[in-house]
Structure formats: structure tokens, C-alpha cells
């Protein structure tokens, strides 16, 4: 008996994002074989989005690009960004998921950022590079991310993405409630 397959395209080749998509889908659809593939997808926003709206738009742009390139059951994009809120600077990620003609948008948890990190980002640096310098790491954005470093490993970029994906999947899990 052949197992049913769900094909997922992730708008990034970053292993953290690909693993988060695979993990979330495996939790949501344990009876299916999940085939997850990453692909380079342009965000159409700055490499380090500095606003909530740019971050959200980057995720949407990546999903739309993937939909135009290859056939799949689901398309995922995760875009990390920063913004300065009334409580201070924070980093977060938007999740865009497309399935058939429907698009769902979700957002991961907010991680407060030290002001010195935010100031470096305002000066044009990317968060991963700033964190690598501050914590003497290499390519942290493809590992635990700023989340892993600032929480001392109690949460990671991947765990945040996985939870955000699960939440953003709600309209697909309950389509009758989301007309």
C-alpha cells in the first residue's frame, strides 16, 4: 500500500526554515509522507527588513514566487524582520502559507532585542551578522538564530518557526471555519 504524500516547497534554502516546515507538517499530518524542498525565492524587500509591513510582504512575495515556479501541495515562506515598538526593538518572523487558492499569514513570537543590536541593524547590518559578532558565532542564522543565543538555547529560530507554521495552518485544518 502506497502512503499518501504531501509536497511542500519552502521559499528558502536555509536548513532551519526547511526543517521547521518539515517538522510542523509531520506533526499536523502524521499519516502522510512529507516531502519538503527548499528553493531560492526573492523577498522583494531589503535583506534585513526593518518594519513589520516589509517583513510580512517579504514572506508573501516569496510564497507567490514559489507558486509560479513549481507544483506543490503547500508553499511556505518565513521572513525574519525587526521593528521598534512602543516597548522597544524586537525581532519576529512572518509566515506565509499557500495551499490551492488560499493564503494564510501568521507571525512568530516577538523577541526583544538589545538596543545596541537594533542600532547596528539601523546602520545597515543584518541580524545574523550582528549576533555572530556579539556572541562570537559563525552563521547563527542557519542554526539557533538570535532566539537561541538570547534565550541561552531554551528556544530556537526553528522552534519559533515550527510553532508559527502550526498556527498559520489553522485555516487549512479547519476550512469550514475560514470561508
Curated annotation (Swiss-Prot):
Cofactor: Mg(2+); Mn(2+)
Organism: Shewanella sp. (strain MR-4)
The reaction(s) this protein catalyses: XTP + H2O = XDP + phosphate + H(+); ITP + H2O = IDP + phosphate + H(+)
Keywords: Hydrolase, Magnesium, Manganese, Metal-binding, Nucleotide metabolism, Nucleotide-binding
EC numbers on record: 3.6.1.73
GO annotation (BP), single: thiamine metabolic process
Cofactor binding: number and manner: Binds 1 divalent metal cation per subunit; can use either Mg(2+) or Mn(2+).
Entry annotated with the keyword Cell membrane: no
Role summary: Phosphatase that hydrolyzes non-canonical purine nucleotides such as XTP and ITP to their respective diphosphate derivatives. Probably excludes non-canonical purines from DNA/RNA precursor pool, thus preventing their incorporation into DNA/RNA and avoiding chromosomal lesions.
Broad class of enzyme this protein falls into: hydrolase
Pfam families attached to this UniProt entry: NTPase_I-T
GO molecular function: ITPase activity; metal ion binding; nucleotide binding; ribonucleoside triphosphate phosphatase activity
Family from the record: Belongs to the YjjX NTPase family.
Chain positions recorded as substrate binding sites: 71-72
Protein name, entry field: Inosine/xanthosine triphosphatase
Binding positions (Mg(2+)): 71
